[in-house]
């Protein structure tokens, strides 16, 4: 994490339980991020919060530290049964739940608290075996949690801490009825510590907070900045004929360490994957049709560096928390302004620099004014020289319906890989000055 992203508040100076302090110190957490510095002093007084913060700001560690500290500092409810977790953390997607659980396990190392995770798309019985052994902190998606509640496998009547993460996405995905169902089965709001985090604190999110929380304190960092200052944004106006060649050329020039390419439809994403794979890139595809096990495998490959580029729709990418994404390419401008903010928020996280490149093509250019109005600034326009775009581009490959996406690695076949700015043919010079000129 970049030091410029941190505050002057030290975790060691906060009134935290010794076991929490030890876990933080051993994992290299010394200074708080701004959202942690603002929210933890409130939460450590057992006051509820409704926090507004973008992804990558450290909000996950903020609510995990508060949750662990609260459970370690609060007596266990009298008569608590093995099927009664003491804390529940609700997330909109499997991927986010998995990431939260990984961070929670870091803090759980020196405590007696057990962490369990449940989500759809995985073995029901395997997850049930974990629950049958008893968990203190339950992390998961609402649908699977409700399944276990309705069957009596878990009871929420001993809950002492509640976290609702990415509440705005909960609304987008239609999970609010599920959330209210779960809240109604917990102790009263004044008998538990309640935490809500959201990228935007819209009226509907605030209404949810005040309905199910105990006079929450609003914690807001950079409320007027919907996009991070660490992200360099630019937009091109390509013709439909140039659009794919422009993307391939920009990727060739930028040679991103780790990039996500967003498109608005499944068909367009599949087409993008075919061209990128054919051009020799290590690329994975995420759409709503990708099976859960394959989805997890692709994300692991992308996170570990086996894949350099991820092509995704908005629905498939919701809840992704992947570090070190250097570039985001909006092949299509999204129809929803909030989706633009969520897309580019995949890069420039935790104080790091990021690049966002958008295409305002003939089909989606009319979305740009609304996006710029929503983010309160104009996106710098970049021009390009059509004659300098790549021409010797291999034909797209067919999607391997029975094989993992992104398994072909033409770079490795060619040897040690292409140097930055060099094309497959070897002799072509970098096009940084020929292809892009800013106006």
UniProtKB/Swiss-Prot annotation:
Protein's organism: Shewanella sp. (strain W3-18-1)
MF (Gene Ontology): ATP binding; ATP hydrolysis activity; RNA binding; RNA helicase activity
Keywords assigned by UniProt, alphabetized: ATP-binding, Cytoplasm, Helicase, Hydrolase, Nucleotide-binding, RNA-binding
Function summary: DEAD-box RNA helicase involved in RNA degradation. Has RNA-dependent ATPase activity and unwinds double-stranded RNA.
Gene that this polypeptide is encoded by: rhlB
Basic residues bias locations: 425-439
Stored PANTHER family: ATP-DEPENDENT RNA HELICASE RHLB, ATP-DEPENDENT RNA HELICASE RHLE-RELATED
Family: Belongs to the DEAD box helicase family. RhlB subfamily.
InterPro entries: DEAD/DEAH_box_helicase_dom, DEAD_box_RNA_helicase, Helicase_ATP-bd, Helicase_C-like, P-loop_NTPase, RNA-helicase_DEAD-box_CS, RNA_helicase_ATP-dep_RhlB, RNA_helicase_DEAD_Q_motif
Protein name: ATP-dependent RNA helicase RhlB
Stretch list, region Disordered: 398-439
Residues the entry annotates as binding ATP: 53-60
Self-association state and partner proteins as the record states: Component of the RNA degradosome, which is a multiprotein complex involved in RNA processing and mRNA degradation.
GO biological process: RNA catabolic process
Lipoprotein keyword on record: no
UniProt key word Hydrolase: yes
A GO CC term assigned to this protein in UniProt: cytosol
Superkingdom classification of source: Bacteria
Motif DEAD box per UniProt: ranges: 165-168
Enzyme Commission no: 3.6.4.13
SUPFAM superfamilies listed in its UniProt record: P-loop containing nucleoside triphosphate hydrolases (SSF52540)
Main location: cytoplasm
Catalytic activity: ATP + H2O = ADP + phosphate + H(+)
